[in-house]
Amino acid sequence: MEVAAKLFGARLSAQKARLVADQVRGKRVEEALDILTFSPKKASSIIKKVLESAIANAEHNEGLDVDELKVATICVDEGPTMKRIKPRAKGRADRIFKRTCHITVKVAEE
């Protein structure tokens, strides 16, 4: 049985979040939490919160054993992009893209 947790509109790019997601995909939950705890990336703390939420959902909603869980799937999709303006010289302006992403973590028993 797979149990999911989702985060919509996380304030980091999907490209950077996928670097961290690839490290924990398919790992046991305890090992994945260790990897995320000691990773220096910004995405690791965000993905760790979503993973902890999925673990709590599995434990409380479905009654699954936490020691038997593994990260079944983890998906990072692009979210809406906020567009901002940065003034430049001689009346010009540059666009700034503030990217967001949607993170989905599914855990399942081994």
Curated annotation (Swiss-Prot):
GO terms for biological process: translation. Belongs to the universal ribosomal protein uL22 family. InterPro entries: Ribosomal_uL22 (IPR001063), Ribosomal_uL22_bac/chlpt-type (IPR005727), Ribosomal_uL22_bac/org-type (IPR047867), Ribosomal_uL22_CS (IPR018260), Ribosomal_uL22_sf (IPR036394). GO terms for molecular function: rRNA binding; structural constituent of ribosome. Part of the 50S ribosomal subunit. It comes from the Bacteria. GO terms for cellular component: cytosolic large ribosomal subunit. The gene is rplV. The keyword Ribosomal protein applies. This is Large ribosomal subunit protein uL22. Gene3D superfamilies: Ribosomal protein L22/L17 (3.90.470.10). Pfam families: Ribosomal_L22. This protein binds specifically to 23S rRNA; its binding is stimulated by other ribosomal proteins, e.g. L4, L17, and L20. It is important during the early stages of 50S assembly. It makes multiple contacts with different domains of the 23S rRNA in the assembled 50S subunit and ribosome. The keyword Signal does not apply. It comes from Hahella chejuensis (strain KCTC 2396). Keywords: Ribonucleoprotein, Ribosomal protein, RNA-binding, rRNA-binding. NCBIfam families: rplV_bact.
